[in-house]
């Protein structure tokens, strides 16, 4: 039996859900003995056992006081080396990934890069680029969640093509969630410059008869735009931290999820929308076109055309209940086939087995 360690030190619920779901699926398998290493206080549910290692590590990839807790770091590395893993898979960037990779012994290491080209305006852009360069140097394999940026990764970081692997996003998937038909539209996620909140403001003003729920913590650079959003009568704004249950309620209690981004690698929000049977409308930026079955699971709009986006949203909101229910069910089925952890486990194991043969 081969042994694999799944690692995320992120406090991001998406990264946790991704890895925890894979851990649970692989626990059902006889061929792989799976372990999980994550932060001490995860935000999402986890089936804990003697194979789940929860540590009080720094929760962000940047440098903090906890980064230099060397006794804890070395104890983690010692524990890893003692288990003689065949593979170690890192779902998110983190400063501790690097020493673990360097001292992993014979284990094959896999690192996911979510942002090949860090988003302009993001406060962490320099750190992300630096971390990308470092993990490309030390990891055996680099994993991308989309096909669009494979060549960009190869060119930007001077990495050989045989070290780059594509693996679709995945999430734990619930049962189908019936439509509520309440005429609400959801914009969800941390409000950063690249998320297109400037676009959202114009779209909101072009659609005065549509009700918008805008939920997400606000980047300091976006306070002014969000302040203007808050004044719009058709906007309900929530900038507080939301729990898993509150997130679920947000998606369930809307008809459409909108993604008016200025740039994107891929969107976890689209995966979450499908998870709760909600179709999407998005700008065709980055790798987002890989995620939308056009006119079936949702709609794509030419990047930056807010007027066209507003027109498409009005059109979507005007469909009758039967037509919407058909779109909603298709979005769920499309997303489940493409993104459910239960289906992704075979692709993930194949990645590990192919890497082991090299």
Predicted feature locations:
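Active-site proximal beta-strand in glycosyltransferases
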Residues: 87, 102-120
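Nucleotide-activated donor-binding/catalytic signature segment of Leloir-type glycosyltransferases, i.e.
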Residues: 224-248
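Donor nucleotide-sugar binding/catalytic pocket of nucleotide-sugar-dependent glycosyltransferases
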Residues: 137-175
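A conserved mid-protein helix/loop that constitutes part of the nucleotide-sugar donor-binding site
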Residues: 16-21, 192-206, 271
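Conserved acidic donor-binding segment of nucleotide-sugar-dependent glycosyltransferases
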Residues: 294-295, 299-307, 315-321
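A short, well-ordered alpha-helix in the C-terminal region of glycosyltransferases
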Residues: 322-338
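Short His-centered aromatic/hydrophobic patch
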Residues: 90-96, 113
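Acidic donor-binding loop of glycosyltransferase active sites
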Residues: 250-266, 278
């Amino acid at each position: 039996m081969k042994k694999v360690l799944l690692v995320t030190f992120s406090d991001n619920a998406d990264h946790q859900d991704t890895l925890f779901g894979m851990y649970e699926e692989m626990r059902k398998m006889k061929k792989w003995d799976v372990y999980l290493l994550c932060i001490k206080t995860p935000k999402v549910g986890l089936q804990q056992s003697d194979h789940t290692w929860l540590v009080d590590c720094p929760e962000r990839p940047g440098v903090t006081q906890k980064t230099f807790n060397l006794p804890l770091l070395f104890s983690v590395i010692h524990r890893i080396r003692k288990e003689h893993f065949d593979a170690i898979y890192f779902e998110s960037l983190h400063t501790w990934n690097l020493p673990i990779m360097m001292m992993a012994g014979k284990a094959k290491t896999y690192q996911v890069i979510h942002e090949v080209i860090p988003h302009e305006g993001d406060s962490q852009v320099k750190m992300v680029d630096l971390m990308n360069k470092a993990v490309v140097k030390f990891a055996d394999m680099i994993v991308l969640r989309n096909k669009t940026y494979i060549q960009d990764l190869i060119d930007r970081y001077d990495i050989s093509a045989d070290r780059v692997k594509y693996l679709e996003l995945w999430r734990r998937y619930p049962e189908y969630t019936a439509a509520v038909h309440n005429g609400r539209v959801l914009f969800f996620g941390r409000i950063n410059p690249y998320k297109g909140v400037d676009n959202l403001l114009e779209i909101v003003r072009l659609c005065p008869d549509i009700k918008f729920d805008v939920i997400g913590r606000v980047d300091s650079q976006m306070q002014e735009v969000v302040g203007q959003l808050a004044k719009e009568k058709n906007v309900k704004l929530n900038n507080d931290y939301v729990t898993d249950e509150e997130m679920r309620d947000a998606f369930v209690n809307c008809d459409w999820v909108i993604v008016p981004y200025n740039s994107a690698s891929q969107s976890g929000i689209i995966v979450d929308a499908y998870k709760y049977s909600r179709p999407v409308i998005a700008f065709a930026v980055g790798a987002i076109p890989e995620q939308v079955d056009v006119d079936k699971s949702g709609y794509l709009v030419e990047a930056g055309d807010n007027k066209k986006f507003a027109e498409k949203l009005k059109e979507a909101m005007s469909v009758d209940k039967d037509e919407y229910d058909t779109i909603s069910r298709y979005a769920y089925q499309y997303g489940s086939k493409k993104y459910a952890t239960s289906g992704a486990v075979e692709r993930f194991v194949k990645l590990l087995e192919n890497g082991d043969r090299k």
